[in-house]
């Protein structure tokens, strides 16, 4: 695995740990953060897979855009499109006043993240 891919994976795992920690917190859980870091984990794993395959990607938080690039090398991942659409909303939307995630929404985000993470890690032989 390329060193830059390893860096993406390390950062993705940091986001995954934060997403899980926030949803499990008994005192002052930050469900918005859990949703955000679930999205960030998946974004970084997608970028890791693209990086490993030498596929250029721009600066985007849109998981569907990254998926479209990845389909060239991972065509079965199209089945993840709905999960990615659902997670993309958390890149920005819940970080500002107006929307707030509850525990149920955070659980859904972490569940989707865990599913996509498992598939991409398998693809990266992790």
Residue ranges of predicted features:
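Terminal alpha-helical segments
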Residues: 1-126
